């Protein structure tokens, strides 16, 4: 086995810390049914089945099989007869359960579900192609995926750096980054992929190489930033992208790439709806309300990265562009000119890890509490200490800086 393949396998199986629970170490956050249905519907609507005698479907991290079940269920009956389904996962129990689930529901469909590491598979195929004059790589017409979400702190800095080298990535690497690049290598020309990921790559420095790859190795069709919808139990802010396969690398561009975002609107009342994902079809700037009392602002526009292939992604609409122009005219300076800027804590961490009353909680003050700068501290040149005790926030932060990067506290 080559070193790249060994690396991919060890990264996906890594349990670096003895106290890290298996789902977190493996990144196995399974997909809610409504999100699986949403992604499957988008794939089927975008796919062109007319010229294909056989249709190969792939889930590279099959988990419990929910995504494949949703996708096959959405296919027209005449198409299902032409379908051959493939799924990989490093968890043997998950593979067995998914196989039983799918074969019972779709007895006429051929399933090839294997305990296999997808990254290892792609690297091996890539190395084999170097030794032959003609590519023997298996391509897939439809890919649906929710890749493992494992942060650098859990993978370990050394393995993350090796993954980056193997897949041509730069900076900090989360495990879903190489998954995205690997999907582009097995998606057939004119094939369709629908992928669920964290939305971190859209705005972080470490996501620069992934943003470029998405704009060069796919034909990106639509991006959904699902913001603080809290669709997952894990503290992950999800996103979905829909893309078409290409025959060769493209010049990076964002022309006509649709972009939808949904974020909670604290003070707005909106039209009532029972399904949070159904709100994604709302018009730009509409507010929708769901039964749990939350209200969401939906933005519909196009992807804007400022003309930079590695630039931060945002939704561009006529109203938002006018607002940004106004902000620009009244801007004294930007934070990046003053000091190094890091991404802040996601809103899903509020109330659980961020408090102003750590000294009063049962069991005493945790030893890993650190002071946190919030908007209440912000002022010109130097942060302030808020007058109100309730605004003096501290965060339970279980990581530390080391010579090789950030690491979890053991």
Give the ranges of each region predicted by the language model.
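S-adenosyl-L-methionine
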Residues: 1-47
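Signature of N6-adenine DNA methyltransferases within the class I
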Residues: 24-25, 29-38, 61-69, 82, ...
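Conserved class I S-adenosyl-L-methionine
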Residues: 53-61
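Conserved S-adenosyl-L-methionine
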Residues: 74-84
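Short, conserved SAM-binding/catalytic segment
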Residues: 98-109
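Polyanion-binding catalytic cores of nucleic-acid enzymes and NTP/SAM-utilizing transferases
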Residues: 312-410
């Amino acid at each position: 086995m080559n070193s790249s393949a060994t690396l991919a396998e060890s990264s996906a199986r890594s349990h670096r810390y003895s106290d890290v629970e298996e789902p977190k170490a493996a990144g196995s956050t399974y997909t809610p049914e409504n999100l699986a249905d949403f992604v499957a519907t988008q794939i089927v609507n975008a796919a062109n089945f007319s010229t294909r005698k056989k249709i190969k479907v792939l889930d590279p991290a099959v988990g419990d099989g929910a995504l494949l079940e949703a996708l096959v269920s959405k296919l027209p009956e005449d198409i299902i007869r032409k379908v051959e389904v493939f799924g990989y996962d490093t968890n043997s129990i998950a593979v067995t359960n998914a196989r039983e689930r799918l074969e019972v529901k779709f007895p006429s469909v051929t399933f090839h579900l294997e305990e296999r590491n997808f990254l290892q598979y792609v690297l091996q195929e890539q190395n084999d192609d170097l030794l032959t004059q003609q590519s023997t790589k298996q391509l897939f017409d439809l890919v649906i995926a929710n890749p493992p979400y494992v942060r650098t702190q859990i993978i370990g800095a050394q393995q993350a750096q090796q993954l980056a080298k193997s897949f041509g990535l730069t900076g900090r690497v989360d495990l879903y980054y190489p998954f995205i690049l690997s999907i582009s290598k097995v998606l057939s020309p004119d094939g369709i992929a629908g992928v669920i990921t964290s939305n971190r790559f859209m705005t972080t420095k470490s996501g620069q190489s992934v943003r470029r790859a998405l704009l060069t190795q796919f034909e990106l069709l639509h991006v959904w930033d699902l913001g603080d919808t809290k669709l997952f139990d894990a503290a992950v802010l999800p996103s979905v992208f829909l893309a078409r396969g290409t025959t060769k690398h493209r010049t990076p561009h964002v022309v006509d790439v649709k972009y939808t975002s949904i974020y909670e609107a604290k003070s707005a009342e909106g039209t009532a709806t029972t399904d949070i994902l159904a709100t994604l079809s709302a018009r730009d700037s509409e507010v929708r309300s769901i039964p749990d009392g939350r209200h969401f602002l939906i933005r519909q526009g196009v992807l804007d990265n400022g003309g930079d292939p590695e630039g931060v992604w945002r939704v561009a609409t006529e109203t938002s562009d006018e607002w940004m122009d106004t902000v620009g005219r009244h801007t004294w300076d930007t934070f990046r000119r003053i000091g190094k800027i890091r991404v802040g804590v996601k809103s899903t961490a509020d109330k659980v890890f961020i408090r102003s009353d750590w000294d009063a909680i049962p069991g005493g003050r945790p030893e890993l509490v650190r002071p946190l700068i919030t908007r209440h501290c912000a002022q010109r040149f130097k942060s302030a200490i808020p007058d109100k005790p309730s605004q003096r926030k501290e965060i339970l932060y279980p990581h530390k800086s080391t010579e090789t990067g950030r690491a979890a506290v053991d």
